[in-house]
Every structure is written in structure tokens, then in C-alpha cells.
From Swiss-Prot:
Keywords: ATP synthesis, Cell inner membrane, Cell membrane, CF(1), Hydrogen ion transport, Ion transport, Membrane, Transport. This is ATP synthase epsilon chain. InterPro entries: ATP_synth_F1_dsu/esu, ATP_synth_F1_dsu/esu_N, ATPsynth_dsu/esu_N. Belongs to the ATPase epsilon chain family. It is found in: Cell inner membrane. It is a peripheral membrane protein.
Length: 134
């Protein structure tokens, strides 16, 4: 077992002893067990699966952030965390459409392009998780 803390800008979402954590990173989905090697990586939009020490499994949708794995402590600092059934599908569809439309504009600055690419990736991941839950 190890300690997992999932934190957003508004506060702690989860803190407790866990057996395993599975999360989506820039390098793909990874699983973390006790005594995992030291790791600092970017979190990308996707599913966060937590298997608690008592066997209970919790699943969340997360957006962008940073994962810090250090011995018996793991910290996930993320922009947003959602219960899978709390994803606002209509809103995410609207944000995805907006991002797709904006990205067709050839006059976007690099900063604007990066913003809308992140928005598109975030919304698409959340929509995929919401549809998988149904």
C-alpha cells in the first residue's frame, strides 16, 4: 500500500491508502503499485482508477496535471476531476465543436492553437469516458 493524494486548485478530491492507481499520462496509461520507481510526468485527459486498500474501486475522469510518484507517496495535481456520471455531455459536445471550428482558422496564434487543441483533447476524452459509462 501507499498514500495517494488527488488535488485540484479548489482542494483535495481523494486522500487515502491505495493498492493500485491507473492513470493516463503523456506516455500512455500507467499503473502504479507499491514501491513504484520515482516518476514525475504529465497527466493527460482520461480515466483515473483507484483501487483502495480495502478493495473498493473508485473511478474518475481527470484533465491535465502532474503526477509525482515518490516511494510510498503519490500526488496527482490536476486541473479538474469529475465523477464519471457527472460529466456534462452537452457542454463537452459544445466545447468540442467550438474547438474544432476555431482550429480551422489559419490565423490563430500558437498560443490560441495550443489552447483549442487542449480543449479539443479534454472534451473528447471526457465524452469518451461518459459514453463508456453508459
Amino acid at each position: 500500500m501507499y498514500r495517494l493524494d488527488v488535488v485540484t486548485p479548489t482542494g483535495s478530491v481523494f486522500s487515502g491508502d491505495v493498492y493500485q492507481t491507473v492513470i493516463t499520462t503523456a506516455d500512455g496509461e500507467i499503473g502504479i503499485l507499491e514501491n513504484h520507481m520515482l516518476l514525475l510526468t504529465n497527466i493527460t485527459p482520461g480515466k483515473l482508477r483507484i483501487e483502495k486498500a480495502d478493495g473498493e474501486v473508485k473511478e474518475f475522469a481527470v484533465t491535465y496535471g502532474v503526477l509525482d510518484v515518490r516511494g510510498d507517496k503519490v500526488i496527482a495535481l490536476v486541473e479538474e476531476v469529475f465523477e464519471l456520471d457527472e460529466i456534462n455531455v452537452d457542454n463537452e459536445k459544445q466545447l468540442l465543436e467550438e474547438a474544432n471550428q476555431k482550429l480551422q482558422n489559419e490565423n490563430l496564434s500558437e498560443e490560441e492553437k495550443e489552447h483549442y487543441e487542449k480543449q479539443r483533447s479534454r472534451s473528447q476524452a471526457l465524452l469518451n469516458l461518459a459514453s463508456a459509462k453508459v
